[in-house]
Structure formats: structure tokens, C-alpha cells
Amino acid sequence: MPNVIEITDFAAPELDVYARLTQAQLRSRLEPEKGIFIAESPKVIARALDAGYQPISFLMERKQITGPASEVLARCGNAPVYTADRAMLAQLTGFELTRGVLCAMHRPLLPTVEEVCRNARRVAVLEGIVDSTNIGAIFRSAAALNMDAVLVTPSCCDPLCRRAVRVSMGTVFQVPWTQIGSTAADWPEQGMQQLHTLGFKTAAMALTDLSVSIDDAALAAEPKLAIVLGTEGDGLAHTTIAACDYTVRIPMSHGVDSLNVAAASAVAFWQLGKH
């Protein structure tokens, strides 16, 4: 039976993870090994459990306990289940709960780039992408369209922030990922060198005079390719483009010269992930 606890005190410290800690505080939780993230909705939580992530506690509407969340709860032993009606939960968290369920989970230590890229042939590299919706959408496309791994630079949005996890529909738990470089100063020079040492050719998604079409046969022939996508608005840094082996453009019509980075990633993964 679930360990159900009716909420009577909004100030209870065990509710801090849902109501009062910032994303940065959740991520560090004083020490990296104590980091926490929030998964939202039964389907997303189930995918996290499938991937081996460990639950800490739940926050949900009462009706969810015997409804859509029941299968997830059956997998989680005695994890505390804090509950109230929807209006009270919205007052506590400051937002409407999607499908009425949140789960605080332990954040694992990140694997190394070498571990994530072992046996990988196509990887996505995300530079400075700060919008959590874009991060979630890119991870969903990466999982669906044949990317073997995703690498994020230190300036990227956290892939395990609540909105990114929700938008990804939990696919952030299905595709291997890690951070490339410990600090922003490690990218692009050290990060690119690491990719080249691992045998990857690098392809910058950018529009320059030297860009080749995304359907260029040379790209498809590369045994190991890292597809590098840049921040919203400004795109990739000039130093990143210069460090890449290829600069790649997506042919477009009606005078359009660029796509949102999430849309561009889906096109790139579809075309370049056919291996």
C-alpha cells in the first residue's frame, strides 16, 4: 500500500523540493551527489523508473492514488506520497500540475563523455541552448531519430529541469547523455579535441559561405559524426564553427534561412542519423 500523507502544513520541510527550492538548489542540493530533480506525470515517472532512477517522494492529487498513478506507486515501495486536492496543490507549488502527479527523484552522477560515446556513431552536441522547452524537444527528437547520445555544454539548460523532462516526455531518460566540459572555458577547444580523439568528425549546423547541404554524401559516409547545434537566436559561436570539420546547412524554401533549433535538430537527426 502507498505511504499516503495528507498535507496539513504548507511549511513542512519535506515539501521544500516541490514548493520552495529553486532549480539550481535542487540540482546541487548542497552537494552534487545529493541532487534532486522533479519528474511530472505517470508516463514520465514510469520512464524514469524504467531507466533505474530512484524516487524520493511523490506529490499528487488524491484521485491519482487509485487512478493513473497507481501502477507507478506499486513500483515504489514505501516512498512518501503527499496528497491534497488540485487547488491546494496549485497553491503550494505555484502552478497547475500536469496530470496531477510530481515525483522527486535522486539525480545520478553524470557519466563521462567516453562512457556515453562508447559504441556511438551519431551524437548530438548542444551548445548554450538555454530554453528548457527546446532542450526537451531536442531530446525527444534525438531519442526518436537515431542519435546514440547527447552531449550538452556547461552553458546549456539542465536537461533534468522539470519543464525539459516534461517536454521530452521522459525520453531524456532513454537516450544516454552527459555534459562535455566541466566549465564554459573547456568548450569548444577542449571539447572538440575530446570528440576528435574519440574518432568523431564534427558537423556544425550553421549557414556560412562554406556550408554543405545536409544531404551531402560525405556526411552520410562518416562512420562517426557529432552534430553540433547552437543557442537560440545567435546560433553557434564562430570559434565552434571554425573548430568543426563540416559546416552544414538545411536547404529551405520561400526565402527562409533558419529554423528554430528544436525544429532544425529534428531535420538534422532524421537526415544524418540514417546509419
Model regions: which residues?
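Boundary-proximal intrinsically disordered activation/regulatory segments immediately upstream
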Residues: 1-68, 156-157
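RNA substrate-binding interface of SAM-dependent RNA methyltransferases
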Residues: 5, 106-210
